């Protein structure tokens, strides 16, 4: 899992009407899908393309990588493709187009249809420790907290439909969004809750 990175953007650079907390979550990963609308010979693609691997006994797709944008694609026989690793929606689309062009250059009549963002992952750091057990007790219908299995509290927000992983350190991971605004909205929704369960003394839970 990616470690949460930059969040403490100076307040004067943040539009407080959109980000009242003064914190803007960083986008860490975009997962997108596209349909190339043609059946593919995966063995031929793996042999013809650079940075491609295909082991059908392990996984029924070609795994292909490009450096710019730094992404990985899963390319299936049906012509469906999953692109992961981009840091923005535009970069994800650009990378998916690059993969489609590689397939075209290998003489497959690949098209670029039904491009969709399936998941956006963001992260941030509120810069204060959080009383996870008390937060869980107060929001049991939305949360799952089993520290012996996973150190973070899982918070399933209903609106927007985003899942948050909340760690005692104040690091937050947000996943499940289809558009970046849902990441921002989910964080602004949770920020007052996190503030209410801020650890005043790091020794006490």
Curated annotation (Swiss-Prot):
Database matches in Pfam families: TBP
Key word Repeat present: yes
Entry's localization field: Nucleus
UniProt KW keywords: DNA-binding, Nucleus, Repeat, Transcription
A molecular function (GO) term: RNA polymerase II general transcription initiation factor activity
Keyword Nucleotide-binding: no
Ranges of the Sequence repeats in the UniProt entry: 27-103, 117-194
GO CC annotation terms, alphabetical: nucleus; transcription factor TFIIIB complex
GO annotation, biological process: DNA-templated transcription initiation; transcription by RNA polymerase II; transcription by RNA polymerase III; transcription initiation at RNA polymerase III promoter
Function in brief: General transcription factor that functions at the core of the DNA-binding multiprotein factor TFIID. Binding of TFIID to the TATA box is the initial transcriptional step of the pre-initiation complex (PIC), playing a role in the activation of eukaryotic genes transcribed by RNA polymerase II.
HAMAP family: TATA_bind_prot_arch (MF_00408)
Family according to the record: Belongs to the TBP family.
Subunit-structure text: Belongs to the TFIID complex together with the TBP-associated factors (TAFs). Binds DNA as monomer.
Protein name in the entry: TATA-box-binding protein
Top-level taxonomy: Eukaryota, Amoebozoa, Evosea, Eumycetozoa, Dictyostelia
Gene of this entry: tbpA
């Amino acid at each position: 899992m990616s470690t949460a990175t930059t969040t403490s953007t100076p307040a004067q650079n943040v539009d407080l009407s959109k980000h009242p907390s003064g914190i803007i979550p960083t986008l860490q990963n975009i997962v997108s899908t596209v349909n190339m609308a043609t059946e593919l010979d995966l063995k031929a693609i793996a042999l013809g393309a650079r940075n491609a691997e295909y082991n059908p006994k392990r996984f029924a797709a070609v795994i292909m990588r490009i450096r710019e944008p730094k992404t990985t694609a899963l390319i299936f026989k049906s012509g469906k493709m999953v692109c992961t690793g981009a840091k923005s929606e535009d970069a994800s689309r650009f990378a998916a187009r690059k993969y489609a062009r590689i397939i075209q250059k290998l003489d497959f009549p690949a098209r670029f249809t039904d491009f969709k963002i399936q998941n956006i992952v963001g992260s941030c750091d509120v810069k204060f420790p959080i009383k996870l057990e008390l937060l869980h007790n107060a929001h049991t219908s939305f949360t799952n907290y089993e520290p012996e299995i996973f150190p973070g509290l899982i918070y399933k927000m209903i609106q927007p439909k985003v899942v948050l992983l909340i760690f005692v350190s104040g690091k937050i991971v947000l996943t499940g969004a289809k558009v970046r605004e849902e990441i921002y909205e989910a964080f602004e929704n949770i920020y007052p809750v996190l503030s209410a369960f801020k650890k005043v003394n790091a020794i006490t839970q």
